[in-house]
Amino acid sequence: MNHLRAEGPASVLAIGTANPENILIQDEFPDYYFRVTKSEHMTQLKEKFRKICDKSMIRKRNIFLNEEHLKQNPKLVEHDVQTLDARQDMLVVEVPKLGKDACAKAIKEWGQPKSKITHLIFTSASTTDMPGADYHCAKLLGLSPSVKRVMMYQLGCYGGGTVLRIAKDIAENNKGARVLAVCCDIMACLFRGPSDSDLELLVGQAIFGDGAAAVIVGAEPDESVGERPIFELVSTGQTILPNSEGTIGGHIREAGLIFDLHKDVPMLISNNIEKCLIEAFTPIGISDWNSIFWITHPGGKAILDKVEEKLHLKSDKFVDSRHVLSEHGNMSSSTVLFVMDELRKRSLEEGKSTTGDGFEWGVLFGFGPGLTVERVVVRSVPIKY
């Protein structure tokens, strides 16, 4: 049966990203948020929110939900009312559309006919419906009706690592497979007015943005037709951190997606991440974490700071994660693929020898509900100038 499997590891062959056109500047967001939610009388809470925004290290975010949408659905600005139907009516349509935009860019870079796509993986924590966002995205793209689809809802911020893990397994076990994997989240699912008793909500309003990212994954790239690997996906792993239950979560309620984020999350991740690294890199003989490149989900500034401090990383190791956080905020599952895209583009622009900032080996990390950590050992490819 080995003739049915590919030889060699799967590779990322193309990357595409997309964001809504509507841009919100972080410095202006506290005034905007309290104005549109008719909460300007909550002056002390607004000042707390302003401090959260100031510390976020976010410059701007792309947000689908604009004032016109809020005028059409005025209950969305209230804190705790039944708005799930209105949110889902929007997101069931918009999530596949934004995902399609990212897919189209990845397919264009790949340069092959979309009829060669054999599998589609889609993940989103923004909406749930039947048939799912995978079905609607496939229809929008005009993919073959026999494309093999996988839909994963409610993974959250580690979902970017998950789609790579599953895409790798599919590509390596099905000779000739070309897997289109897409992550898309639109935070209209959790936009609500403020409350003095819900400070976690304010953190979510301050850091989350909207985005979609897609990758084409396949083994044995066919260079005769122009396929070129960007990164090899060498190994994958997933773990639930000890004593972390309840620290990150999301709950679908009549008022939308209710978000949980415990203050201990940065400490929990930083205290446990080296164990994940040792398990991943001991077989390769690597123990110097400054000798690898990093594709890290920037869940927030504090997570990056704590990991950098704990592992004694050089300040440039998270430059791509910090850039994506600054320009887009936390876009949930797609964010880490934005970081991967930023890394390979910056490596080319700066004349580096490989797609991984000049390093051969690297790691991709996603952190999310559970607290779940998804990791992928990644190998860069030489850049030909």
From Swiss-Prot:
Identify the enzyme class.
transferase
> According to its UniProt record, which residues of this chain constitute the active site?
C157
Where mainly found?
cytoplasm
Under Gene3D superfamilies, the record lists: 3.40.47.10
Entry-linked Pfam families: Chal_sti_synt_C, Chal_sti_synt_N
Keywords of the record, alphabetical order, are:
Acyltransferase, Cytoplasm, Transferase
Q: Which family does it belong to?
A: Belongs to the thiolase-like superfamily. Chalcone/stilbene synthases family.
Instruction: List the PROSITE patterns hit by this protein, alphabetically.
Output: CHALCONE_SYNTH (PS00441)
Q: What is its EC number?
A: 2.3.1.-
UniProt cross-references to CDD domains, sorted A to Z: CHS_like
Q: Which InterPro entries match?
A: Chalcone/stilbene_synt_C (IPR012328), Chalcone/stilbene_synt_N (IPR001099), Chalcone/stilbene_synthase_AS (IPR018088), Polyketide_synthase_type-III (IPR011141), Thiolase-like (IPR016039)
Purpose: Polyketide synthase responsible for the biosynthesis of secondary metabolites.
Question: In which tissues does this protein get expressed?
Answer: Expressed in glandular trichomes.
Name its cellular compartments: Cytoplasm
Provide a Gene Ontology MF annotation, just one.
acyltransferase activity, transferring groups other than amino-acyl groups
Indicate yes or no for the key word rRNA-binding: no
- Recorded protein name is Polyketide synthase 1
- Give the highest taxon in the source lineage: Eukaryota
